[in-house]
Structure formats: C-alpha cells, structure tokens
C-alpha cells in the first residue's frame, strides 16, 4: 500500500511531500482511539524481550524516531501511532527561524539516501513548548533536540542552548544537545573538547535547576576521526551525560550522483557503516559504560541488529522511514525478534555490544 503512496509523493518535491506527510500524521493524531489502535497493531510482533531501559527510560523496543522529521512537535501522537518506542522532536532553537533557502531537501532513491540543508528551520522553543503542554498521550519517551540560532555568534551559543533547556526540558523525557549539524555555520566546532565541555557543563547546570535528573544526550557527527570520538566520549563521561546519539548526517559523498554536489548533510544507506564505526569506537572507549543511541542508514531488522551488536542500546530512524513508510516498525520487530532468538539472545540488552565480547563469554 505504501509503495503506491510513496510513488505519488515522490512525484512532488521532497519538502512538499514532507509537509503533506506531516499534515497527515498531525490529523491522525487528533483521534486518540485510532492512534492507540494503530500502535497496538504495529507492536503485535514485539515480545517483552525487545524492551530496553536507557538512562532510566523504558523503551518498548529498540526502534525509535530520530529528530528532524517533526521539528515543531506537530505530529507526535501520529508518530507514536506508527509504533516507534520513542519520538524525538527538533532541532529547536530559542527563536523561530526560516532555515536555509529552498530547494534544501533532495532525494537520491538509487542510493536510498537524502541530502538536506534545512538549517534548523523551526517555529521556536516557546511554540513547541505550548504544543507539548497540550499533549495528553505519551506511550513512550519523548526527546527534545536543541540547537542554536543561525545568527547567534558561536561564543554565545551556550546562551541559546540554556534558553532551550528552560523552555523545553521540563516537558520532555530527555534532552539532546545537537552540536553536529553541518547546516549551521561553525556549529561542529562545538564538538571540540574545550568548547564541548563548557557547553555541556552549562546545560547540565541549568538542567539540575529546571528539570533535575533529566537525562542529557549529545548528538555527534559521523565525520569525527577515531581520536576525536575518544575525546568526545571522555568529555561526555566527565560531564556525566546519559549517553551519545551517533550519528548525525555526513558531509562526505561516497558516490557519484548529479545531486552529490549539493551542500548539506547526507543521510540514509551510505551513512550506515560510518555511523556503525563511530558507535563501535565510542562503545570501546567507554568500555560499554556510556549508553549509545545509534542512527544512520537503518531500513531493516538486520540494520537494527548490527547497530545493537556494535554497541547501541536503542536505534533511531529517519531516512528509512521516508522510504519504508508508516509500516516500518511493524515490519522490523518480528524479524528482529527472530534474529535475537536465532543467536540465542533472550533480550535486547543481551546483544548490546555483543560483537566486542570474546567468543564463549557470557551474554
């Protein structure tokens, strides 16, 4: 069914199709009964062994939605109806901003990929907070992904993140510092150890005041060198973060394509292995002590399974959802359960980081 819908949507520009899809999910969310029914159907193939706990949050299964799809918390209920164990909104900034000029979103179907240079387009933290206050149904964790406004000087970026914490942290279940988007000039410099430590320290300090105990995650780029990943992990642990989200989009172009010259972040299948490499490195650096939410190139249960084995505790999707449609979660879960059983794992937590364990070691 979605194949036909996708064919029609793919006749439109990528951004117009996105707006139509979000509008549909928004209107779906107006019917609580329908949302609950659809979610129940999507989770039929999710046995209890698929549940996992990260930073004190319970995920019904390890397949969650990444930030970027619902920037303004307009379709949270409709997205939960699709079966996601968690939904992450944003990236949100203190003040509304239009983002970069269009066209700014491009499909590359033959590579199962997207290129975007959206530029943190959003209605601002205050408006998103108002929507979250009206929410009455939350069957799983809701994450709030925050960033800085484009016109905020880098040396004042901390103020923007703290302002977002004030507005949004009490309303979400976890907070994500996005310091890795390639579409806000200079933003990735915040991943450098000294600046990152200052930023995370300030955010943690404010969180302790406005939302004590709220888990804080950091979203990082797939383009970091192995040594840079080590530095980020060390800073994250020093600042007592709940975990990392690995990874954002890449500026690399590992193929020839007419659209490859377009500026922006590449997501989808080409990011799968670079993201997995960052997950492995981060897991090894922390000895498995720092939880990781893996994202990048997830389309199938096998993709989810590989990220879990590499060290992720939860796996997020975005581009895969665009290509696979609203039935994606329901299609993945039964096969994921089969993969776990095939390899002798009774629970998701048993397979996390499994590829790093020596043969014969206990699960």
From Swiss-Prot:
Assigned GO CC terms: cytoplasm; plasma membrane
Keywords: Cell membrane, Flavoprotein, FMN, Membrane, Oxidoreductase, Pyrimidine biosynthesis
Gene Ontology biological process terms, A to Z: 'de novo' pyrimidine nucleobase biosynthetic process; 'de novo' UMP biosynthetic process
Annotated residues for binding of substrate: 71, 116-120, 178, 183, 248-249
Membrane topology recorded in Swiss-Prot or TrEMBL: Peripheral membrane protein
Primary localization: membrane
GO molecular function term, any single one: dihydroorotate dehydrogenase (quinone) activity
Catalytic reaction list: (S)-dihydroorotate + a quinone = orotate + a quinol
Co-factor requirement: FMN
Active site: 181
Subunit structure: Monomer.
Protein known as: Dihydroorotate dehydrogenase (quinone)
Species assigned in the record: Myxococcus xanthus (strain DK1622)
């Amino acid at each position: 069914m979605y194949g036909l819908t996708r064919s029609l949507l793919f006749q439109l520009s990528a951004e117009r199709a996105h707006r139509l899809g979000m509008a549909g999910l928004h209107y779906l969310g107006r019917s609580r009964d329908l949302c609950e029914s659809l979610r129940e159907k999507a989770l039929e193939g999710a046995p209890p062994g698929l549940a996992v706990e990260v930073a004190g949050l319970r995920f019904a299964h390890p397949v969650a939605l990444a930030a970027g799809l619902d920037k303004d918390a307009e379709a949270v209920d409709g997205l939960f109806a699709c079966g996601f164990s968690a939904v992450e909104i944003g990236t949100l900034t203190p003040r509304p901003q239009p983002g970069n000029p269009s066209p700014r979103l491009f499909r590359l179907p033959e590579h199962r990929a997207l290129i975007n240079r959206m530029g943190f387009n959003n209605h601002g933290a205050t408006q998103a907070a108002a929507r979250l206050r009206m929410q009455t149904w939350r069957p799983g964790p809701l994450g709030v992904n925050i960033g800085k406004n484009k016109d905020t000087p880098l040396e004042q970026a901390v103020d923007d993140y703290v302002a977002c914490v004030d507005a949004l942290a009490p309303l979400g279940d976890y907070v994500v510092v996005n310091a890795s988007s390639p579409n806000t000039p200079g933003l990735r410099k915040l991943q450098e150890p000294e600046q990152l430590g200052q930023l995370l320290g300030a955010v943690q300090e404010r969180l302790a005041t406005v939302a004590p105990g709220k888990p804080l995650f950091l979203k990082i780029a797939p383009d970091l060198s192995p040594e840079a990943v080590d530095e980020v992990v060390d800073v994250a642990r020093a600042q007592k973060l709940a975990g990392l989200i690995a990874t954002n989009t890449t500026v690399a172009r590992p193929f020839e394509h007419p659209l490859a010259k377009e500026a922006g972040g590449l997501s989808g299948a080409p990011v799968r292995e670079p993201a997995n490499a960052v997950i492995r490195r981060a897991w090894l650096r922390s000895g498995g002590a720092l939880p990781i939410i893996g994202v990048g190139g997830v389309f199938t249960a096998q993709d989810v399974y590989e990220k879990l084995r590499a060290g992720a505790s939860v796996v997020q999707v975005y581009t895969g959802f665009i290509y696979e449609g609203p039935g994606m979660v329901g299609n993945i879960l039964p096969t994921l359960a089969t993969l776990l059983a095939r390899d002798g794992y009774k629970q998701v937590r048993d397979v996390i980081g499994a590829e790093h364990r020596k043969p014969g070691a206990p699960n």
